[in-house]
């Protein structure tokens, strides 16, 4: 049975879900930063998904990346599945701009995470839910 890793649960807020993945927003206001987590138990690598799920993951990742770049006018989309700290398969999608605090370096460890201001987190969640509104997206 699929259960979200407690570290992802603590560091993120749920935006909603697509047919395969839960969509999470990282609680770091420095960047538009989403994480896709395939809703499959005991999976830490993409190759451990069956072929249909691998194809669905690529579709969902591309869908999320394209919508994020359009919404936030990014210069570069950083996508990565590291898993060194949290082994549960999760794929980071970070919109990067030439003016963000870490540019051009990777976001991890570059600057301290910045909490969302009061009310801003809820606004961002609503904004993203609207961005992903489709027949297959289910808001959290």
Which residue stretches match the model-derived regions?
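HIT superfamily nucleotide-processing domains
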Residues: 1-89, 93-140
């Amino acid at each position: 049975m699929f259960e979200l890793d407690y570290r992802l649960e603590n560091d993120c807020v749920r935006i909603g879900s697509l047919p395969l993945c839960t969509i999470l927003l990282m609680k770091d206001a420095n960047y538009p930063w989403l994480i896709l987590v395939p809703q499959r138990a005991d999976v830490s690598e993409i190759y451990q998904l069956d072929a249909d799920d691998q194809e669905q993951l690529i579709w969902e990742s591309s869908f999320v990346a394209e919508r994020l770049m359009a919404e936030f006018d990014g210069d570069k989309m950083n996508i990565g599945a590291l898993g060194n700290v949290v082994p549960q398969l999760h794929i980071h999608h970070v919109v990067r701009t030439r003016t963000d605090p870490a540019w051009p370096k990777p976001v991890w460890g570059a600057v301290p995470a910045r909490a969302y201001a009061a009310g801003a987190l809820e606004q961002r969640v609503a904004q993203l839910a609207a961005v992903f509104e489709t027949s297959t997206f289910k808001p959290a």
